């Protein structure tokens, strides 16, 4: 891959820590003491953004009341603006749904654990339609070891840089403390329908002091979710003929996951803390027959119920925190390594994303991420009370994928400047960033937060991300909040890599029926989005009501090309001289909607909480097609009753609005038949409760999908040879499921 290199030394990003030490030492070197008069300290910009209309917090108590069966995405999806979708509107890998914030897609959702990026899903091959065979990155931390989850949407998320154009999910774990505490939790669920996979998990956590200045935290987890039966969707599949007669779209695959993580916190001085952390996780699937095009072969059938992909994630980090006379500082260095081991798949046409019987066995793709981050927060009085944040960041991502760059050019013809075989399996990218934010108190109740972030990508080049957020108290009870920011996402390593090649004999070629290639493009621009929101909130005596309008003007979204850039030379028969497409930037797209919240205290201990997301539009402005298949509206409602000091009861319901499929097929023609099918509105209700048996023991029980509303996957959104499209019916919604949980703590 070509690159515009930027020399960078990651340890320079720890300069904030070194600067803080230097300033502190200068003030203490002669024994002098810096005395500060009484002053108001304004919150940092990061703290202030958590009060923005596009920010929601999920607490440990919330998780205990609505325990996920295995993956945290199950509770994150209940926040305003959040749904579970695929990366595109194709419906491929339809049951591998991930967090989608404000309709921008999972690839534009940045996942963090304790403020540090999680990138394991980027080790999974990126398909022609923009999908990955991935469960996402929200299942690396056991639910019972989470302190809180911050869900940050819109302009407030732009400060986090690459990949946060839709939003950020920051999973905060329970930390080391001054007293010894521990917990052991078990959870099991029991689907009413035996064809649906059950879940069970067990986790432990232990934290406390080792010495006066040394403390620790360790947690572990083992969990299993069984796969659905391979034929769960029989009788619901789209029409299939010829070689595809009798094939079925798969249900939800299962997963076995194990996690262990340890943290050591050393209080160097009263002002400084140094943390060392290491973690290891393993996730392995339980295969139920899913392929990219919902087709099948004997190899697929042989592997039913077996493990066909394994993800091994290792993380190592060191973090320094300082509280100084002049402000505070944070610096960390994190190394993340993901080994993605899976069965070899085809890369051409209908065989893309299906096990390759001619190349049986596993391969391993390895992704290495290095992140260095440093920032200082400086309280100032320059006309107004304010806190200035200055920081820098350096990231490097290296991918070695020996399977995904193996498509040859014998049939379609040779491509100028590309080796027909034995291409490099390696790709990499580096980003250097500087950022500044200033949280200014213009008057009591009025906060203005301007910000600017500069990112230099060694292949894509420079990106500037300005932002401006405002919070103004109209009255003691009513607050107006507004924000605008330019967010961005760099192309991923597959899109940028000219050695990454896919092939089709014509079925997947836009605008024509002859053969074609899709090639990586190192001339891509970064995706950008100007995110705007305007919200108003009323709050008084537990009553909270808010309404927020948001609009994202999306530019340079990266999709597979719509026009050939060249033609191959030579080849075989009717497939010779294949058209050459490449990943390209779509000029303009738009996402627009409303978010509402309403919390009503009905009586002592009884509260009714609601949030609504209503999508006004989500479309590619060039084609008019949808960006992703999301419900027209989503309403989450919960009645929460603290019946006694020991007993808590909840009733929940989520209504999903109509879901419309994409309008155009792979050739650019209007879809017909079952590919037009929409999903009608539906609701999922639940009941749950927790009871504290003693000071150290609590019991939970409940039922999900109380009224047994089930959905079945019919196929992908649009068809291929022998398989009709399924429209929006691309995923399974499991039926009534009972669960129990037990937690012991001290």
Swiss-Prot record:
Molecular function GO terms recorded: colicin transmembrane transporter activity; enterobactin binding; enterobactin transmembrane transporter activity; siderophore uptake transmembrane transporter activity; signaling receptor activity
CC annotations in GO: cell outer membrane; outer membrane
Membrane topology: Multi-pass membrane protein
Localisation per UniProt entry: Cell outer membrane
Main location: membrane
Short sequence motif named TonB box, residue ranges: 39-44
Induction: By iron and enterobactin.
Alphabetized NCBIfam families for the sequence: PRK13524.1, PRK13528.1, TonB-siderophor
Protein name per UniProt: Ferric enterobactin receptor
């Amino acid at each position: 891959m070509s690159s515009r290199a930027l020399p960078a030394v990651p340890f320079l990003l720890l300069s904030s820590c070194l600067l803080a030490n230097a300033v502190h030492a200068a003030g203490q070197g002669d024994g002098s003491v810096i005395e500060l008069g009484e002053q108001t300290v304004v919150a940092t910009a990061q703290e202030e953004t958590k009060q923005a209309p596009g920010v929601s917090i999920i607490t440990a108590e919330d998780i205990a009341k609505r325990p996920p069966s295995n993956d945290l995405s199950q509770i994150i999806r209940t926040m305003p603006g959040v749904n579970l979708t695929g990366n595109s509107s194709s419906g491929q890998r339809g049951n591998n749904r991930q967090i989608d914030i404000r309709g921008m897609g999972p690839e534009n959702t940045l996942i963090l654990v304790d403020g540090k990026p999680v990138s394991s899903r980027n080790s999974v091959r990126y398909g022609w339609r923009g999908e990955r065979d991935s469960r996402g990155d929200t299942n690396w931390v056991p639910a019972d070891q989470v302190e809180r989850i911050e869900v940050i949407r819109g302009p407030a998320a732009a400060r986090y840089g690459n990949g946060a154009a839709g939003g950020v999910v920051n999973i905060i774990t329970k930390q080391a403390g001054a007293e010894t505490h521990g917990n052991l939790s078990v959870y099991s669920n029991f689907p009413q329908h035996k064809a649906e996979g059950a879940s069970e998990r067990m986790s432990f956590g232990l934290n406390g002091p080792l010495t006066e200045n040394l403390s620790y935290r360790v947690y572990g987890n083992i969990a299993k979710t069984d796969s659905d039966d391979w034929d769960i969707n029989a009788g619901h599949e789209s029409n299939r003929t010829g070689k595809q007669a009798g094939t079925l779209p798969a249900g939800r695959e299962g997963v076995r996951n194990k996690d262990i993580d340890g943290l050591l916190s050393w209080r160097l001085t009263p002002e400084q803390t140094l943390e060392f952390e290491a973690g290891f996780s393993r996730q392995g699937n339980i295969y139920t027959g899913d392929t990219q095009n919902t087709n099948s072969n004997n190899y697929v059938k042989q592997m039913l119920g077996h493990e066909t992909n394994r993800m091994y994630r290792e993380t190592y980090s060191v973090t320094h925190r300082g509280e100084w006379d002049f402000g505070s500082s944070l610096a960390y260095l994190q190394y993340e390594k993901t080994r993605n081991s899976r069965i070899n798949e085809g890369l051409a046409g209908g065989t893309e994303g299906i096990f390759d019987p001619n190349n049986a066995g596993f391969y391993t793709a390895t992704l290495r991420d290095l992140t260095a981050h440093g920032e200082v927060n400086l309280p100032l009085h320059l006309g107004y009370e304010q806190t200035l944040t200055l920081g820098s960041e350096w990231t490097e991502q290296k991918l070695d994928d020996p399977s995904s760059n193996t498509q040859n050019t014998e049939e379609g013809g040779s491509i100028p400047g590309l080796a027909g075989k034995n291409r490099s399996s390696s790709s990499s990218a580096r980003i250097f960033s500087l950022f500044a934010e200033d949280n200014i108190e213009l008057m009591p109740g009025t906060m203005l937060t301007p910000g600017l972030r500069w990112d230099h990508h060694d292949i894509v080049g420079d990106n500037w991300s300005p932002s401006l957020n405002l919070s103004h108290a109209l009255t003691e009870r009513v607050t107006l909040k507004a924000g605008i920011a330019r967010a961005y996402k760099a192309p991923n390593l597959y899109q940028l890599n000219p050695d990454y090649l896919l092939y089709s004999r014509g079925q997947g070629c836009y605008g024509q029926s002859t053969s074609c290639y899709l090639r990586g493009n190192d001339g891509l621009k970064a995706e950008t989005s100007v995110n705007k929101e305007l919200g108003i909130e009323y709050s008084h005596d537990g009553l909270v009501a808010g309404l927020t309008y948001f609009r994202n003007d999306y530019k340079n979204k990266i999709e597979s090309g719509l026009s050939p850039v060249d033609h191959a030379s030579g080849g075989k028969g009717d497939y010779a001289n294949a058209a050459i497409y490449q990943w390209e930037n779509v000029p303009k797209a738009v996402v627009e909607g409303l978010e509402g919240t309403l919390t009503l205290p009905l009586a002592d201990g009884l509260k009714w909480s609601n949030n609504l997301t209503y999508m006004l539009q989500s479309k590619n402005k060039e084609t008019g097609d949808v960006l992703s298949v999301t419900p027209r509206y989503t309403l989450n409602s919960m009645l929460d009753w603290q019946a006694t000091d020991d007993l808590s009861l909840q009733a929940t319901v989520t209504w999903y609005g109509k879901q419309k499929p994409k309008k155009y097929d792979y050739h650019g023609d209007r879809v017909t038949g079952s590919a037009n099918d929409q999903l009608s509105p539906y609701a999922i209700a639940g009941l749950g409760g927790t009871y504290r048996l003693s000071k150290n023991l609590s019991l939970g029980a409940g039922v999900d999908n109380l009224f047994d509303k089930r959905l079945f996957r019919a196929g992908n959104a649009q068809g291929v040879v022998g398989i009709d499209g399924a429209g929006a019916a691309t995923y399974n919604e499991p039926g009534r499921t009972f669960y129990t949980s037990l937690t012991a703590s001290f």
